[in-house]
């Protein structure tokens, strides 16, 4: 989902990322491909106006998401389909939805680098990440292991 998307959703749902990756690999050699990783999240706002749902969003940093969750205290659940935590809360007549990019979601996405033996990773946007993201990337990008070894070592994260 993108900034002007008419429907709220994840900016990089795990299944969508992997499906797109497989499609790109049909034309681009794996040793030339960097996997894009989002260091941001969108906070989606849905409002009912004149009987229609108006959707808008704002891109925020991982730190800002933590602040919102701390202030609003929504229930945060693991969304298996997106490979992300999801939170939703109401404020006035609006419903806010957040598919959270964090160390767990980035861990799962960056595992695709090993699974498909890619050249590496790129990210958007530097400064929007939390400190723990660098530890995840250090573990996943510098350690030489294949996907099966990664999956075995990270079985709790992959579940």
Predicted regions and their residues:
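Substrate-binding surface in catalytic domains of secreted glycosidases
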Residues: 1-69
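Solvent-exposed, polar/charged alpha-helical surfaces in well-ordered, non-transmembrane soluble domains
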Residues: 18-22, 107-111, 115, 135
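Aromatic/acidic polysaccharide-binding cleft in carbohydrate-active enzymes
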Residues: 36, 45-51, 124-137
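Aromatic-rich peripheral "rim/lid" segments of glycoside hydrolase catalytic domains that contact
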Residues: 112, 127-159
